Protein backbone atom coordinates (compact mmCIF):
# COMPACT_ATOMS: atom_id res chain seq x y z
CA UNK A 1 0.00 0.00 0.00
CA UNK A 2 1.36 3.38 -0.97
CA UNK A 3 1.79 6.15 1.58
CA UNK A 4 -0.90 8.20 -0.18
CA UNK A 5 -3.38 5.30 -0.03
CA UNK A 6 -2.58 4.78 3.63
CA UNK A 7 -3.19 8.47 4.38
CA UNK A 8 -6.53 8.42 2.55
CA UNK A 9 -7.60 5.26 4.37
CA UNK A 10 -6.60 6.80 7.70
CA UNK A 11 -8.57 9.99 7.01
CA UNK A 12 -11.67 8.01 6.00
CA UNK A 13 -11.39 5.81 9.08
CA UNK A 14 -11.10 8.85 11.33
CA UNK A 15 -14.01 10.49 9.54
CA UNK A 16 -16.20 7.46 10.16
CA UNK A 17 -15.23 7.46 13.82
CA UNK A 18 -16.02 11.17 14.04
CA UNK A 19 -19.68 10.43 13.32
CA UNK A 20 -20.03 9.39 16.93
CA UNK A 21 -20.93 5.95 18.13
CA UNK A 22 -24.03 7.33 19.83
CA UNK A 23 -25.62 7.94 16.42
CA UNK A 24 -24.73 4.53 14.96
CA UNK A 25 -27.23 1.80 15.64
CA UNK A 26 -25.74 -1.22 17.36
CA UNK A 27 -28.10 -3.53 15.49
CA UNK A 28 -26.60 -6.26 13.35
CA UNK A 29 -27.55 -6.57 9.72
CA UNK A 30 -30.23 -9.16 9.03
CA UNK A 31 -31.65 -10.77 5.92
CA UNK A 32 -33.01 -8.32 3.33
CA UNK A 33 -36.52 -6.95 3.70
CA UNK A 34 -39.10 -8.74 1.56
CA UNK A 35 -40.73 -6.95 -1.35
CA UNK A 36 -44.07 -7.35 0.45
CA UNK A 37 -42.80 -5.55 3.57
CA UNK A 38 -41.02 -2.94 1.46
CA UNK A 39 -44.32 -2.14 -0.25
CA UNK A 40 -46.04 -1.83 3.14
CA UNK A 41 -43.40 0.60 4.40
CA UNK A 42 -43.60 2.62 1.19
CA UNK A 43 -47.40 2.72 1.36
CA UNK A 44 -47.31 4.03 4.94
CA UNK A 45 -44.76 6.69 3.99
CA UNK A 46 -46.76 7.82 0.97
CA UNK A 47 -50.00 7.84 2.99
CA UNK A 48 -48.32 10.33 5.33
CA UNK A 49 -47.36 12.44 2.32
CA UNK A 50 -50.90 12.37 0.91
CA UNK A 51 -52.36 13.26 4.32
CA UNK A 52 -50.17 16.39 4.35
CA UNK A 53 -50.58 17.25 0.64
CA UNK A 54 -46.90 16.63 -0.14
CA UNK A 55 -45.50 14.88 -3.21
CA UNK A 56 -42.72 12.38 -2.54
CA UNK A 57 -40.51 9.70 -4.00
CA UNK A 58 -39.86 6.69 -1.76
CA UNK A 59 -37.11 4.08 -2.01
CA UNK A 60 -36.54 0.93 0.00
CA UNK A 61 -33.12 -0.76 -0.09
CA UNK A 62 -31.69 -3.91 1.45
CA UNK A 63 -28.84 -3.81 4.02
CA UNK A 64 -26.28 -3.57 1.19
CA UNK A 65 -28.04 -0.58 -0.36
CA UNK A 66 -29.53 -2.51 -3.29
CA UNK A 67 -32.89 -1.12 -4.41
CA UNK A 68 -35.83 -3.37 -3.42
CA UNK A 69 -38.78 -1.05 -4.12
CA UNK A 70 -39.30 2.44 -5.52
CA UNK A 71 -42.31 4.66 -6.15
CA UNK A 72 -42.70 8.30 -7.14
CA UNK A 73 -45.96 10.21 -6.70
CA UNK A 74 -47.27 12.25 -9.62
CA UNK A 75 -45.86 15.77 -9.82
CA UNK A 76 -42.88 14.96 -7.58
CA UNK A 77 -39.79 16.80 -8.76
CA UNK A 78 -37.59 14.55 -10.91
CA UNK A 79 -34.51 15.19 -8.79
CA UNK A 80 -36.17 13.44 -5.86
CA UNK A 81 -35.93 10.06 -7.59
CA UNK A 82 -32.20 9.55 -7.02
CA UNK A 83 -32.17 11.54 -3.78
CA UNK A 84 -34.66 9.12 -2.16
CA UNK A 85 -32.56 6.13 -3.24
CA UNK A 86 -29.35 7.74 -1.99
CA UNK A 87 -30.89 8.63 1.38
CA UNK A 88 -32.02 5.03 1.83
CA UNK A 89 -28.58 3.69 0.85
CA UNK A 90 -26.85 6.08 3.23
CA UNK A 91 -29.07 5.01 6.14
CA UNK A 92 -28.47 1.32 5.40
CA UNK A 93 -24.73 1.51 4.83
CA UNK A 94 -23.96 3.75 7.82
CA UNK A 95 -26.52 2.17 10.19
CA UNK A 96 -28.06 5.48 11.22
CA UNK A 97 -30.75 7.91 10.14
CA UNK A 98 -29.52 10.50 7.69
CA UNK A 99 -30.75 13.12 10.19
CA UNK A 100 -27.85 12.05 12.46
CA UNK A 101 -25.44 12.83 9.62
CA UNK A 102 -27.18 16.15 8.99
CA UNK A 103 -26.91 17.11 12.66
CA UNK A 104 -23.22 16.14 12.86
CA UNK A 105 -22.45 18.16 9.74
CA UNK A 106 -24.37 21.17 11.06
CA UNK A 107 -22.14 21.23 14.17
CA UNK A 108 -19.13 21.85 11.93
CA UNK A 109 -15.64 21.02 13.14
CA UNK A 110 -15.04 17.28 12.98
CA UNK A 111 -18.57 16.84 11.66
CA UNK A 112 -17.39 18.22 8.32
CA UNK A 113 -15.53 14.94 7.79
CA UNK A 114 -18.87 13.39 6.86
CA UNK A 115 -18.39 14.99 3.47
CA UNK A 116 -15.51 12.56 2.84
CA UNK A 117 -17.62 9.45 3.44
CA UNK A 118 -18.58 7.76 0.19
CA UNK A 119 -22.34 7.62 -0.22
CA UNK A 120 -23.17 9.49 2.98
CA UNK A 121 -26.17 11.78 2.52
CA UNK A 122 -26.37 14.30 5.37
CA UNK A 123 -29.99 15.30 4.72
CA UNK A 124 -32.97 14.10 6.77
CA UNK A 125 -35.21 11.51 5.13
CA UNK A 126 -33.35 8.18 5.34
CA UNK A 127 -33.99 5.70 8.18
CA UNK A 128 -32.76 2.12 8.75
CA UNK A 129 -35.53 -0.48 8.87
CA UNK A 130 -35.38 -2.78 11.90
CA UNK A 131 -37.10 -6.17 12.03
CA UNK A 132 -36.57 -8.56 14.93
CA UNK A 133 -33.78 -6.28 16.16
CA UNK A 134 -31.79 -6.44 12.90
CA UNK A 135 -31.33 -3.94 10.11
CA UNK A 136 -33.14 -5.43 7.10
CA UNK A 137 -32.86 -2.36 4.90
CA UNK A 138 -33.65 1.33 4.90
CA UNK A 139 -36.25 3.75 3.62
CA UNK A 140 -35.51 7.04 1.90
CA UNK A 141 -37.91 9.85 1.04
CA UNK A 142 -37.46 13.00 -1.00
CA UNK A 143 -39.77 15.61 -2.41
CA UNK A 144 -40.54 17.99 0.41
CA UNK A 145 -38.49 19.91 2.92
CA UNK A 146 -36.07 17.60 4.72
CA UNK A 147 -38.20 17.52 7.88
CA UNK A 148 -41.21 16.51 5.76
CA UNK A 149 -39.13 13.77 4.13
CA UNK A 150 -38.14 12.62 7.62
CA UNK A 151 -41.73 12.62 8.84
CA UNK A 152 -42.79 10.39 5.93
CA UNK A 153 -39.76 8.10 6.36
CA UNK A 154 -40.61 7.71 10.05
CA UNK A 155 -44.19 6.75 9.14
CA UNK A 156 -42.88 4.08 6.77
CA UNK A 157 -40.25 2.76 9.15
CA UNK A 158 -42.73 2.53 12.03
CA UNK A 159 -44.71 -0.30 10.45
CA UNK A 160 -41.69 -2.60 10.12
CA UNK A 161 -41.31 -4.64 13.29
Model-derived features: positions:
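Residue-level signal for beta-strand positions within conserved beta-sheet cores that form or flank
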Residues: 4, 19, 54
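Flexible, solvent-exposed loop/hinge segments and secondary-structure transition points
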Residues: 23-161
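Bacterial N-terminal signal peptides that target proteins for export
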Residues: 1-10
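Bacterial N-terminal signal peptides
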Residues: 9-20
